[in-house]
Amino acid sequence: MPPEKKRKTEPEDKAEVTQQENDVAESTTEPNNQTVTDSKEEPSVTEAALATTSSSSPPVLSASETAQPDTAATSQSSSTPPTSTSAAESAAAKARERAERFRALQARAKSSSQQNLKKATKESQRLQSDPSQLTALGRRHAIASHKLLKADIEDAGGDFERKRAWDWTVEESERWDKRMKKKEAHRDDTAFRDYNQQAEKSYKRQLRNMGGPDLERYTREKLAAIEKAAAAGTLEIVETEDGEMIAIDKDGTFFSTADSTQFAQHKPDKAAVDRLVADMRKAEEASLKKRRERMANNGDDADVTYINEKNKQFNQKLSRFYNKYTAEIRDSFERGTMV
């Protein structure tokens, strides 16, 4: 068991404190006196000591100087945001962008599905309805409304033709009468009379299908030819007193004559060539269709055993004379029992 510690009394404590204070005061005064005397005798030693003291001990800064780094650090910390906050903001922006794109894709898919449904419904309705029946129904409705209007006007004591003429101009009425007259003449002219009349009908039909002359293209080509001839010196452009421009052919090669061959140098455009090809294909299809109909009417829609019309006639002649002898052989070939 260790011995008990001795406790100091209050007077002893006070005496010890005063003794320590006196020792500290003496220690502070003695170095000062010593430094003064030593400075007079050894200035180089004191300078070295001061240099070492200044290099070893940190510099003492004032309150303003110590406050400046703190403010700079505070401003730097406030000016540069934390990396975690910027990363979170960028992630949120990307998430919003992805959500907007997803909503746009959803809206686009919804609109496309609705449009597809509408088009499919219209297509099914079109397939279910017969166009010929719709045309016939519209024609019947127009005839019925015409007859009903005519009966109402006649019952009221009016003139139906005069009443109907109020809705049309004179030019429209004349065009309609001309059209009806032409239609009646065409109806009476449908029967075949001779090949010249048939060729004329085909020629007129082809002219109607051409769609009329291209006057704009003709004007462009004409101006280009005039400019080319004027540049070559074979054509002279003269202006009259009235301001009219006249082209004078110097050597007689610009304007076409009976001996000119400029028409052979014409090159049609691609649209005209395509129209010609389509017209030829249409004529060929019509010819094949009539040929099939003619063969069906003559009973020749079975197996084709000929290569041309002459060979067909020869096969028919053989059939007339030898079918009664070869019928059994042909039937055996068809059954597959022929040895």
Curated annotation (Swiss-Prot):
Say if the entry is tagged with keyword Nucleus: yes
Which residue intervals are annotated with compositional bias (Low complexity) in the record? Answer: 45-93
The entry's keywords: mRNA processing, mRNA splicing, Nucleus, Spliceosome
Record's compositionally biased regions (Polar residues): 17-37, 126-135
> Which Pfam families is this protein grouped with?
SYF2
UniProt main location, coarse: nucleus
> What ranges does the record give for the region Disordered, renumbered to this chain?
1-136
Q: Does the keyword Nucleus apply?
A: yes
Where is composition skewed (Basic and acidic residues) in this entry? 7-16, 94-103
Taxonomic superkingdom: Eukaryota
- Localization per record: Nucleus
Any one GO CC term of this protein is: Prp19 complex
Residues of the signal sequence?
Answer: none
Q: PANTHER family from the entry?
A: GCIP-INTERACTING PROTEIN P29, PRE-MRNA-SPLICING FACTOR SYF2
Q: Which family does it belong to?
A: Belongs to the SYF2 family.
Q: What role does this protein play? A: Involved in pre-mRNA splicing.
Quote the protein name from its UniProt record.
Answer: Pre-mRNA-splicing factor syf2
**From what organism does this protein derive?**
Neurospora crassa (strain ATCC 24698 / 74-OR23-1A / CBS 708.71 / DSM 1257 / FGSC 987)
